Curated annotation (Swiss-Prot):
HAMAP family: Ribosomal_uL15 (MF_01341)
Gene3D superfamilies for the chain: 3.100.10.10
Protein name: Large ribosomal subunit protein uL15
Species for this entry: Synechococcus sp. (strain CC9605)
InterPro entries found in the cross-reference section: Ribosomal_uL15, Ribosomal_uL15/eL18, Ribosomal_uL15/eL18_sf, Ribosomal_uL15_bac-type, Ribosomal_uL15_CS
Stretches with biased composition (Basic residues): 12-23
Length: 151
């Protein structure tokens, strides 16, 4: 037998017959059709809409609307405080690749942003990053270093 589209059949037991509700008691789903005896869920025009709570004020109307809109393409940074640079040698060049190699940063997935938390004791560092906070910029330059912004 050749395999053709008009000769395909489902395996035995793979497809189940549709239940015909309300077609007599011999069919097994006659009379109340498995909907119970009385109540809103047994009436015609069922079921109620999603989120309907029986007339109680529904949850999606009780919760306040959000006052902001999420950014479509937010910028993600690998953030690092200036205090993390204290273990580096004086006069060294600091960029994302060197930080990954030294084990200070685990992944070079996102661009580097320097934050100004903590004190900087390392001297004359050349820091290359995508962004600097104003406090990080002043602390690095006060220690005799330079800040290069990468694009």
């Amino acid at each position: 037998m050749t395999l053709r589209l008009d000769s395909l059949k489902s395996n035995k037991g793979a497809r189940r017959r549709k239940l015909r509700k309300g077609r007599g008691i011999a069919a097994g789903q006659g009379a109340s059709c498995g909907f119970g005896m009385r109540g809103q869920k047994s009436r015609s025009g069922r079921p109620t809409r999603p989120g309907f709570e029986g007339g109680q004020m529904p949850l999606y109307r009780r919760v306040p609307k959000l006052k902001h809109f999420p950014l479509v393409n937010p910028k993600h940074f690998t953030v690092l405080n200036v205090s993390a640079l204290n273990d580096l040698k004086d006069g060294s060049t600091v960029n994302l690749d060197s930080l990954v190699k030294d084990g200070i940063v685990t992944s070079p997935k996102h661009p580097l942003k320097m934050l100004g938390n903590g004190e900087l004791t390392a001297k004359k560092l050349t820091v290359q990053a995508a962004a600097f906070t104003s406090s990080a910029l002043t602390k690095i330059e006060a220690a005799g270093g330079t800040c290069d912004i990468l694009h």
